Amino acid sequence: MTDLTSLTIAEARAKLSDKEITAVELTDAYLAAIEAANETINAYIAVTPDKAREMAKASDARIGAGKAGALEGIPLGIKDLFGTQGLHTQACSHILDGFRPHYESTVTQNLWNDGAVMLGKLNMDEFAMGSSNETSYYGPVKNPWRAKESNLDLVPGGSSGGSAAAVAARLCAGATATDTGGSIRQPAAFTGTVGIKPTYGRCSRWGVIAFASSLDQAGPIARDVRDAAILLKSMASVDPKDTTSVDLPVPDYEAAIGQSIKGMRIGIPKEYRVEGMPEEIEALWQQGVAWLKDAGAEIVDISLPHTKYALPAYYIVAPAEASSNLARYDGVRYGLRVDGKDIVDMYEKTRAAGFGQEVKRRIMIGTYVLSAGYYDAYYLRAQKVRTLIKRDFELAFHAGVDAILTPATPSSAFGIADEDLASDPVKMYLNDIFTVTVNMAGLPGIAVPGGLDHKGLPLGLQLIGKPFDEETLFKTAHVIEQAAGRFTPSKWW
């Protein structure tokens, strides 16, 4: 019998339905894989074996009774940003030590309602602030990929590094993730997995620990495009508890896979050809263009003139919202508390001890740009730039473009504790250069593996779609996936 952890969600669903395997067997296979690998990969920060087996048993009973849900018996990993009732939920921060919420996030509740099984909570950058999963209080995640003839540990990307690494290393069938400026798409590109950031409002943010509320959006990371479509169908919903969630029917995304893209117009934005971009990224982009052309799509050059302002504007808007959102962590009601001589001293000591360096940096930036003397010069101007970025996309789509193709990242995965990046945070921020525009405009974006670089590391392509048109992204990404093939790392752990 094949290793159960090698099954995609679609394959496992079929075998469970045909009663070739049981949910308990599948769950035990993943729990064994986690036990063997997690000490090395560090993808999970909390494993929930008892809960997983209990859920799997209930799934087997429902399958036996002919009442199987859409994800019945499928074992998933959950990013530590999602509130899971009575279970570890800390956003991988010291300040939330011991926090176990009394509520379940809407997205995870949707998954459990469809019969999914929870394996545990996944590592991530602290409060989702980072591009390499090195800011976690629980230590860095190791990318399951290594360069050819190298034993150097690489980052899996961030902030959803645990989600991407767990999917790539087959430590879960699929994972939840969140994306504020690229935190689903960049890790997916670094690990040879598929990640989709849906349109802002497609998935409820209720019960998800907030970073930047106008940018955050939940989505799945999966092994292939079909699995991502299956997961998003279950995750997405309107939610009266989240006023930013949109009351639109959730389509059957899986049905879009395999549909023809003949006659579709794919935009290629000239502004994404950034200075110093490696030749391999340009070659991958051209290869993506060729694949879509071969499938009958029409390629059109487009301009998104305000792209160059997206990164600086993002790094004003996101920290500003974060400084406000993170003001609630003060040691009074939950999490870490460091005693002080009075309440203000307690606040200061708790926050000094509880937040990591990158989180402190972003709170400081955010507080600065919101301060009386600088609000107009920074925050207000960044919001105006955001409107212009959104308008660029609207004009492109209005002119008849169906989707936009770009690289997902400016490079393949880099080393853990890279000295060059550690000494210059702005260099780390540049990892988001191709992804932040999508969040600023509230659009859907998907990262799909396009090939390997000369070191044998995965590179991803990104497709950007019209609001709430994730179906077009799935069918187009599937064309790229069919042409490029699927990529799995050689096991070294």
UniProtKB/Swiss-Prot annotation:
UniProt-annotated catalytic positions: K79, S159, S183
Documented EC number(s): 6.3.5.7
The organism's place on the tree of life at top rank: Bacteria
The keyword Ligase is annotated on this UniProt entry: yes
Keyword Cell cycle among record annotations: no
A single GO cellular-component term on record: glutamyl-tRNA(Gln) amidotransferase complex
GO MF, one annotated term: ATP binding
Reactions listed under catalytic activity: L-glutamyl-tRNA(Gln) + L-glutamine + ATP + H2O = L-glutaminyl-tRNA(Gln) + L-glutamate + ADP + phosphate + H(+)
EC class (word): ligase
Gene Ontology annotations of biological process type: translation
Sorted UniProt keywords: ATP-binding, Ligase, Nucleotide-binding, Protein biosynthesis
InterPro entries per record: Amidase, Amidase_CS, Amidase_dom, AS_sf, GatA
Pfam families, alphabetized: Amidase
Subunit structure: Heterotrimer of A, B and C subunits.
Role played: Allows the formation of correctly charged Gln-tRNA(Gln) through the transamidation of misacylated Glu-tRNA(Gln) in organisms which lack glutaminyl-tRNA synthetase. The reaction takes place in the presence of glutamine and ATP through an activated gamma-phospho-Glu-tRNA(Gln).
Family: Belongs to the amidase family. GatA subfamily.
NCBIfam families assigned: gatA (TIGR00132)
Record protein name field: Glutamyl-tRNA(Gln) amidotransferase subunit A
